[in-house]
């Protein structure tokens, strides 16, 4: 990337995150006036200065890591879909579209955006709630309007004797703290100490039409643990995913990397139980990571 383009992106990112020139200059060990001249294109940015500025900005990011619920699949031992929708989820059933098909062998479902509640005439199947990534973000907005949190919702799920089929916890790295290609190389060399015995690292190849065909233009993904197990990690360069899906330049992506903890069945239940008991999503997520890696 040319100097002028790099410093333009740097300044835009600094301002978008509300970080002052004074703060960046102090951390980078340069004067505010010097940084001003760099950002206005009056002076060229050397490779050494570029690295110092990038490191300073990374240090000053507000909340460089944030955690969110990114997937929920829960089965309720009841056939009363209205109770689940209106009393537990606190949505209006009349606002949901009813479809005469479902997933996971359910016969029908109620849909509101990406929020899906599935039903079946078979009592043992009960009512199934599925929220994928977009569904979680949409339901988060409803929770905000209801003055509730995920923890309060999960506590209600437990009261309903819900069976947790899958829960994903996602840690967004906004500052590029995780060096995923480096982690992939460490695993390839057998230098990763983990309870897991399975590692899979690869680079996505869907970027050839957007960037030059070389490894540097591809996003790295690392799976720690078997994808067939009830617990595994997926770590990937989210910025490259946004480049492919939305055409957002890597340097402009709000989230650089993502660390996903994917839990199924009993693993999902115990994670939710810990989350509800401690009321600290961060402690639950990093506790799982520290236990297995």
Predicted regions and their residues:
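Alpha-helix N-cap/N′ positions at the starts of helices
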Residues: 5-6, 30, 48
